[in-house]
Design a protein with these regions (language model features):
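Acidic catalytic loop of the alpha/beta-hydrolase fold
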Residues: 306-310, 336
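Primarily recognizes the serine-hydrolase "nucleophile elbow" in alpha/beta-hydrolase
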Residues: 251-295
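Short beta-strand/loop motif that positions the catalytic acidic residue
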Residues: 295, 301-303, 307
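Short substrate-entry loop that stabilizes the transition state in hydrolases
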Residues: 182-186, 191-227
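A domain-start/cap signature at the N-terminus of enzymes
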Residues: 7-183, 262, 270
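Alpha/beta-hydrolase active-site loop
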Residues: 227-248, 266
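Short alpha-helix in the alpha/beta-hydrolase fold that links the catalytic acid
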Residues: 203-205, 311-320
């Protein structure tokens, strides 16, 4: 009969083998996906740790060295990311509402670029992202993160908290990006994410357009599906309106991407009572033209002509049903136009916001 110590060593070996499966998958993706320095170090530390565990039944000294080395690498990356992120003084913050406390430490552990690109690469391999959508996306996303790091340093992301299921009305992550102006305008933008959850980089891309009117951009988080029309989603939006109200924001523009845009359309009949609501914008996601029309609010619709998820015909019909008071911008782009056609999307948002602010003033 095997001794308990021997059984434990073989159990650790089995754990190492099981850990090596996702690690090898990530290493394979790393050869075709741009990876950050912290991502590379995490992979290296994980390889050392898994290798040490696998060798446990036979090479105890080697096991100890590998496991210790792996843990040192992983914990060092965690410590450095926590220090850099939680002490960052940029305009991009990830806070928890409604308590308005600082970011969850969990949100600082992994670079968002790695989670986004590894996730997209996996979805592409299993058919969740089409070849046309996949083409050029990694390069566009990598370039966006490079620009964001220059402007903001190391920043947090709500991705991990979202997939663990932490986004609830009593505690949800919000990406808040203050304008660059020393004296911001009393204007705020609420931007709702779509399917796969909230990411700081998308909020930052929208905020760069919003900065033209010196307004604050806030991007709340709900579940990763982006089901804003559920009671929890509506409650999160209401809390976000309240947050901006407490900041003395007088005019609020509400917009969304994909499921976020659909959420705006499905909820607008009950959100129309928010006194600060001044306009709506939809990016690759439209719904409920009649209810939107009844608000009498100005509307911006941005749509990709080659969108495989939201047919361009649906956007055109939505615009036709709205009639007057709508600005329609159609781009030669697929569903991921915010990342692939960033400048065109930002210019459309900036021009529309400037026009609305000029009219209101």
């Amino acid at each position: 009969m095997l001794k308990s110590s021997t059984l434990l060593r073989y159990l650790l070996c089995l754990i190492g083998i099981l850990l090596s499966i996702p690690i090898l998958a990530l290493v394979t993706l790393a050869f075709i996906t741009p990876v950050t320095v912290s991502g590379i170090l995490y992979l290296f530390g994980s390889i050392l740790l898994a290798s040490g565990l696998i060798l446990t039944p036979w090479q105890l000294k080697t096991r100890n060295a590998l496991v210790l080395g792996g843990l040192i690498v992983i914990l060092s990356v965690i410590g450095l990311r926590l220090y850099l992120t939680l002490n960052e003084t940029s305009n991009l913050k990830v806070i928890v509402l409604p308590s308005t406390r600082g970011t969850r430490s969990l949100n600082a552990l992994i670079d968002e670029q790695d989670t986004l690109l590894f996730g997209e690469g996996l979805l592409h391999l299993i058919g969740g992202v089409s070849p046309h959508e996949h083409e050029g996306l990694a390069l566009a996303v990598t370039a966006a993160y490079q620009e964001a790091r220059v402007a903001n340093g190391v920043f947090s992301s709500p991705v991990l908290s979202t997939y663990i299921g932490f986004q609830k009305p009593d505690a949800f992550d919000v990406v808040v990006i203050e304008p660059s102006a020393e004296r911001p305008s009393p204007v705020g933008i609420i931007f709702l994410h779509g399917f796969t959850g909230n990411v700081s980089i998308q909020c930052w891309q929208i905020a760069r357009a919003v900065d033209r009117i010196d307004a604050v951009t806030v991007c709340p988080s709900t579940n990763w599906i982006g089901e804003w029309w559920l009671p929890e989603g509506e409650a999160i939006i209401r809390e976000t309106f309240g947050y901006l109200r407490e900041k003395s924001i007088q005019r609020i523009y509400l917009g969304g991407f994909s499921n976020g845009g659909g959420g705006v359309g499905r909820l607008i009949s009950i959100l129309a009572d928010e006194p600060e609501l001044s306009g709506l914008f939809f990016i690759a996601g439209v719904r409920n033209a009649q209810a939107v029309h009844e608000t009498g609010l100005p509307v911006l619709v941005i749509q990709g002509a080659n969108d495989e998820r939201i047919p361009v015909e649906a956007a055109r019909q939505f615009v036709a049903d709205l009639g007057e008071g709508v600005t329609y911008v159609e781009l030669e782009a697929d569903h991921f136009l915010i990342m692939k056609q960033t400048q065109a999307v930002q210019e459309a948002i900036s021009a529309w916001l400037l026009e609305q602010e000029k009219t209101l003033k």
